[in-house]
């Protein structure tokens, strides 16, 4: 073995070390872990994870799990950071390419539009874990994940993002810049889908709360921190190096992931184990997934995965309203990328660097919201009797967040008069950041608990919907703020969140009844009862 291979085998299971280790485990399992079947073509051995199986990612050590979680979460943060860091380079790019503010902000919109395409394409290829719940891996729905897993999309997407972002840094004109940012955003959709699935691979549902909470904050903290860092970077090193900085950030995370993050997707690991066992003793082994899914054509599987999210979105009222609520919030976050430069750079004469600091209030609110969400999960939800936990048990933080959202937005809108100190409006934007976290996280968990076996499709639909809104909102921000004024322009999305505010209250009180009347929610509940032997 080479020196490099020796070093790799001592690390936290890099990609190169996975296969040999799995073969060794597989060979041991031939004698120590009997499988159902006879080992013939007609009656093959059925390979599934054994109790305390070290090849099962859920049985890996806590340090290793959290190390991998931090890598995939930083990947999401890097992508969303890149989406917004561009937004504070307006003056320099508009001057260099002689373009309007609307055409400039299109560079943000197309990047986020790529996120919308991401779940639609990457989701069927790398389903965000299973749609049959961890309660029974044998019930996994067939997707093309068994062909690609999570590792190959990670390598492909990060490589492509680095290439397109590097190209954008050298763009000779605005058309090239916009096209390359769109392509970078499309490949950036892969980490948004794949990272959450990797966390679900590592942690069983009862232990997943904290990891998913931190992961779910990354898509909102990234867009807020992007302008803060990008503003000063633009001022001192120019907009091209802002794109270059983002390229390096994504590239470093991608390389770290290639080195340290092994394949975590259960069906792929079981298939590899079955192949290794077959080679080891010449008998026939297949994974439990192969046994249960039958011989389905990839085209059939891919088509179903593309259609199901839209069926759930438009046929399930819970999914539609929850997705609309989250989309309005997400769109508003990206609206502020165009609004803040108008409010502080244009009207108060701030430089790009100091203009980016206007996002500090929202950032503080997001961090406080994250702390509150962790406290609520550990101090309230986890102390509930497991037999009495319902999907609605997730919603109390969303009630607080639903109130905080319009308060923060109206306060920000009407404290931006020149006669009022700038610090007031920035401080009062914190409730908006607080509300973003406390509405999004509980609603995501509510949808997962309500739709269990269909959770991946539900979340894919919600992700596409909110990304479209995130792409559209910035396009009319400049006209809206210049025509209506900064006070009323900010009040419009505030009124939208006010209209949506009753949703968490209503679902907390009547959600169980509504779920019984929704076809797929009721079906998911029945499937879970059968899987759990109830």
Swiss-Prot record:
Transmembrane residue ranges: 66-86, 103-123, 160-180, 182-202, 209-229, 241-261, 318-338, 354-374, 395-415, 424-444, 456-476, 486-506
CC terms in the record's Gene Ontology section: plasma membrane
Entries under SUPFAM superfamilies matching the protein: MFS general substrate transporter
InterPro entries cross-referenced by the UniProt entry: MFS, MFS_dom, MFS_trans_sf
UniProt keyword annotations, A-Z: Glycoprotein, Membrane, Transmembrane, Transmembrane helix, Transport
Gene3D superfamilies: MFS general substrate transporter like domains
Topology class, membrane: Multi-pass membrane protein
Single GO molecular function: transmembrane transporter activity
Glycosylation sites: 29, 36
Induction field: The promoter contains putative CRE1 binding motifs 5'-SYGGRG-3' and expression is differentially regulated in light and darkness by CRE1. Photoreceptors BLR1 and BLR2 negatively regulate the expression, while ENV1 exerts positive regulation.
Coiled coil: none
Family indicated by similarity: Belongs to the major facilitator superfamily. Sugar transporter (TC 2.A.1.1) family.
Listed name of the protein: Major facilitator-type transporter sor6
Chain's gene name: sor6
